[in-house]
Amino acid sequence: MSLFIRLFQRFTFQKAKGVDIGSEKSKEVQTNEAEFLKAEFNDISISSLPVDSCLILYLETRIEEIRQCLSVKAPLSAIFLIGSTLEGILLGVASKHPAIYNKANSAPQDTKTGKPRNFSEWTLNNFIDVSYEVGFLKEDVKKFSHALRDFRNYIHPYQQMSIGFQPDEHTARICFQVLKAALYQIEQKSKS
């Protein structure tokens, strides 16, 4: 047994008005959520993606525009831009690797010829599924990308109205994290 003696220190005790654990927990949750949403994938460089070099400037401009939409609290616009940017990147990756994309089991086929459709006829859904199958995306990002695709489809006002979709800043930031995670996984796969 140890005995600690503190010399020349004064302790003051006072009655507490109460203990509010809930407020501390909510601060913790908000901090963790805020940290998650602000997290950056620092090693990502658009120029290192396996896409045509002529596309790089356009992708960088879109990423900057997404950041601007988020900074002025335009979540719906950000989500549309994030979804279309993901589609453009996946099309760019497929265009650099047509053989593996067209041989994938989930590649969309022309019903008359049985051959893979041209990439211009693919949907974001097709690009996500095939990118997962050929290893550019992992399952987690595949699933989140499909959710992003669903949100991006609210670009149609009647569909948005029928569901009552009103995204907030957090939804848009989560979508941006999905895009950044996809960029990271594509970059990592292209290095291997």
Language model: regions and residue ranges:
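Flexible secondary-structure boundary motifs
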Residues: 96-145
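Amphipathic, non-membrane alpha-helical segments in soluble helical-bundle scaffolds
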Residues: 1, 52-56, 75-79, 117, ...
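Charged alpha-helical initiation segments
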Residues: 3-76, 177, 191
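Charge-enriched, short contiguous segments at helix-coil
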Residues: 134-192
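Short, hydrophobic, well-ordered secondary-structure elements
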Residues: 63-95
